[in-house]
A protein has these predicted regions:
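Pyridoxal 5′-phosphate
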Residues: 1-177
Length: 177
């Protein structure tokens, strides 16, 4: 039996497959980093946009009394992980609802205070096509020590996203679009 297994292993070397897959993953990190103006070490390949948002929500330390800010036009999965955390901790979820449905730093300003830890939003809204000025919003968040978590699934690969210039702390996007 061992001789048969060895013969099969020589014919169909699964180690070669793993080495090839590792090389492809390494290339994927490099290509994603270029696309986002990030370092390859800053890239994590996850199952989906939703999975990335869940990791973000679980990975940011929130304390009782903290709040997060989001928008009223988000796809449900952008807000859902934070709603789960709200059940575990006494955090407030504040929702930005500008009359013109355009999300700007000025629109977020009234919702932000010293207990705001996270602003979570889409870079480009799925329901109306509004593309927020992420540089403006990123500067706004950085000045206040707020994590900026974005869902970029509608934008990634269509227009440039510079995570460094926009001070984006966590960006998540699936590759299917």
């Amino acid at each position: 039996a061992f001789a048969d297994m060895t013969a099969v292993q020589e014919e169909a070397n699964s180690s070669a497959h793993h080495i090839a897959m590792d090389a492809k993953r390494h290339k994927a990190y490099e290509e994603a980093a270029k696309l986002l103006n990030a370092d390859p070490e800053e890239i994590a390949l996850v199952e989906s946009t939703s999975h990335g948002l869940n990791i973000a929500a679980q990975g940011i330390e929130l304390n009782d009394g903290d709040n997060i800010v989001t928008t009223n036009l988000e796809f449900i999965q952008v807000a859902l992980p934070w709603c789960v955390i709200r059940k575990e901790k006494n955090i407030d979820i504040r929702v930005c609802k500008p009359a013109d449905e355009r999300f700007t730093a000025a629109a977020f300003e009234p919702l932000v205070d010293e207990k705001t830890r996270v602003l979570v939003m889409s870079t480009l809204e799925w329901c109306n096509g509004w593309q927020s000025d992420m540089k403006e919003i990123g500067d706004f968040c950085k000045e206040r020590g707020i994590y900026l978590v974005v869902d970029a699934v509608q934008q990634l690969g269509v227009t440039k996203i510079d995570t460094k210039a926009c001070h984006i702390d966590i960006l998540t996007a699936g590759g299917h679009k």
